[in-house]
Structures are given as C-alpha cells and as structure tokens.
Amino acid sequence: MKKYRDHYFLKAKQENYPARSVYKLKEIDNRFKIFRQGMKVLDLGAAPGSWSLGAAEKVGPRGRVLACDLQETDTVFPDNVTFMQENVFERSEAFENLLDEIAPFDVVISDMAPRTTGTRFTDQARSLELCLEALAVADRCLIKGGSFVVKIFMGPDVQELVQAMRQRFSAVKSFKPKSSRAESKETFYVCLGYRGVETSDTDK
C-alpha cells in the first residue's frame, strides 16, 4: 500500500470517517468555501457516508444534509443528516416528496462513480452519464447562487459536461485534491453561482 494511501486511510480511521474520500471534500471546501453554517446540502452517491459527515460538520446543527445512494450504509449519522437508499435515475415518489420538503438546497455534491469494468472508455462514458444526471437533479432543486460539486472520470467527452455546467453557473473550476490517488483519472468540478438553465429563444 502506498504511503499517501496509508496516510489518508489511517487518518480516516483515527477520525471516525468510513472512507478517506472525506479529505477530498475538505480540500475542495478549503479552496472554494462552498459550505457555511445553516446550509442545506444534497449528497448524491453518499455511501458509505464520509462526504455526508464532512458536510454535516460544515453546516452545523442548524443545517441539513440529505444523503442518497443505491447502496445502504451502516454509518451512524448525526441528527442533521437524513440518509435514503435511492436510485437517482429512477427517483421514487417518496424521494421526490422529500426533495420538495427540504428544497431549495444551497449545495449539491456528487461523488457518484460507476462500477468499473476495466475498460477506460466504458468507465468514462458511464461516469459522464452519472454527472449529467447529478446536474439534472441540481436543476431540480438547487437555489439560485448555489454551488455544485461533481466527480468525473476524465475522458474525451468531458467537454459535454463542462459546457452544460458553464451554461448554468457563473464559475466552473476543475480541481484534483492532493488526497486523490496519483494514478486516479478522477477530477472534481466545482461550480459556483447557479443561474438556472438558460433557455434559447427557439425553446421558449
């Protein structure tokens, strides 16, 4: 096991996080200041729960985190986190109702990743699909001026996502945290200042 992996793996265990990925979110927030006390956060692809725990710390007891994932998790969350086992591609009526109850969200974060096949092109295409679905959820429930953070496996089609995000946000920044593994193809896009979906005259 590589030294940097040892460091973040052990650090997560020592600080009672279920996964090392929380340090990626912490780096993102340190750089871009996306969280504030009292905010409402939607966490897509939340299991095993490290990002939700990290976000919950940042928004505090007056804030709220709605976490969802296809997989169940046995992580014990604080009172300001609600976890729901859910497929964001097939959002149930119960999930839609919960979105309506809590929305609008100040921040939508997505650490979703596909089951990898070992075929880079396939994995990248599936990652893009997840990112676009996360963006569609953000369109559904993100407040104007809000922020969106999404992970993608880099590939030739990433510009499709970047263009879609630039149509919606005042600023779109790419960022690879130091806590990401060096060989990983993942990159995070941090989008600030949500404007909404711009509609052309022909679409009106």
Swiss-Prot record:
What does this chain do?
Answer: Specifically methylates the uridine in position 2552 of 23S rRNA at the 2'-O position of the ribose in the fully assembled 50S ribosomal subunit.
Coiled-coil annotation reads none
Originating species: Nitratidesulfovibrio vulgaris (strain ATCC 29579 / DSM 644 / CCUG 34227 / NCIMB 8303 / VKM B-1760 / Hildenborough) (Desulfovibrio vulgaris)
Where located? Answer: Cytoplasm
Q: Name the UniProt key words of this record, in alphabetical order.
A: Cytoplasm, Methyltransferase, rRNA processing, S-adenosyl-L-methionine, Transferase
Positions bound to S-adenosyl-L-methionine = 49, 51, 69, 87, 111
Q: Does the keyword rRNA processing apply?
A: yes
Active-site residue numbers: 151 (proton acceptor)
Identification of the protein by name? Ribosomal RNA large subunit methyltransferase E
Q: Which GO terms describe its cellular component?
A: cytoplasm
Q: What is its EC number?
A: 2.1.1.166
List the Gene3D superfamilies.
Vaccinia Virus protein VP39
Reactions performed catalytically:
uridine(2552) in 23S rRNA + S-adenosyl-L-methionine = 2'-O-methyluridine(2552) in 23S rRNA + S-adenosyl-L-homocysteine + H(+)
* Signal sequence residues: none
- Please verify whether the record's keywords include Ribosomal protein: no
Q: Which of the seven top EC classes does this enzyme belong to?
A: transferase
Q: Which InterPro entries match?
A: RNA_methyltr_RlmE, RNA_MeTrfase_FtsJ_dom, rRNA-MeTfrase_E, SAM-dependent_MTases_sf
Name the domain of life.
Answer: Bacteria
